[in-house]
């Protein structure tokens, strides 16, 4: 799948998402777009999954009917995520068009 990491997603996570193509929003100049505009541009560009740690994404209007899946990380902190990359990978692998998934990261 073609994945888009927004500005809040730790880049090292990409190496654990085997079999996927990962692009960071900043490389497209999209790191300053609003959530709604980011979703529009990502869909237009053919991205299948947006990976973000922005929990406000759930409040975006019109999430229904979107083609892009959204996976929201429980934390943007790489040390915490690194211990639970299997949870993130499972959520990404299970993502379906238009789905919204929050990945809770257990506290130590």
Regions found by a protein language model. Name each.
Residues 1-48:
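N-terminal first-folded block
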Residues 6, 52-53, 74:
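Active-site-adjacent beta-strand anchor residues
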Residues 13-19, 57-65:
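Short loop/helix-cap segments at secondary-structure boundaries that form the rim of catalytic
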Residues 30, 58, 76-80:
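Glycine-/small-residue-rich active-site loops that bind phosphorylated ligands and cofactors
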Residues 35, 63-64, 81:
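Generic structural signal for well-ordered secondary structure
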Residues 42-62:
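Acidic, metal-binding active-site segment of PIN/NYN-like and related structure-specific nucleases
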Residues 68-108:
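C-terminal structural segments of small proteins and small subunits
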């Amino acid at each position: 799948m073609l994945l888009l990491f927004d500005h809040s997603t730790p880049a090292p996570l990409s190496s654990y998402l085997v079999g996927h193509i990962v692009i960071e929003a900043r490389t497209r100049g999209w790191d300053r777009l609003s959530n709604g505009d980011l979703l529009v541009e990502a869909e237009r560009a053919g991205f299948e999954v947006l990976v973000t740690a922005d929990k406000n994404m759930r409040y975006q209007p019109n999430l229904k009917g979107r083609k892009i899946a959204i996976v929201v990380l429980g934390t943007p902190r790489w040390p915490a995520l690194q211990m639970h990359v299997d949870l993130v990978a499972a959520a990404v692998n299970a993502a379906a068009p238009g789905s919204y998934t929050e990945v809770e990261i257990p506290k130590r």
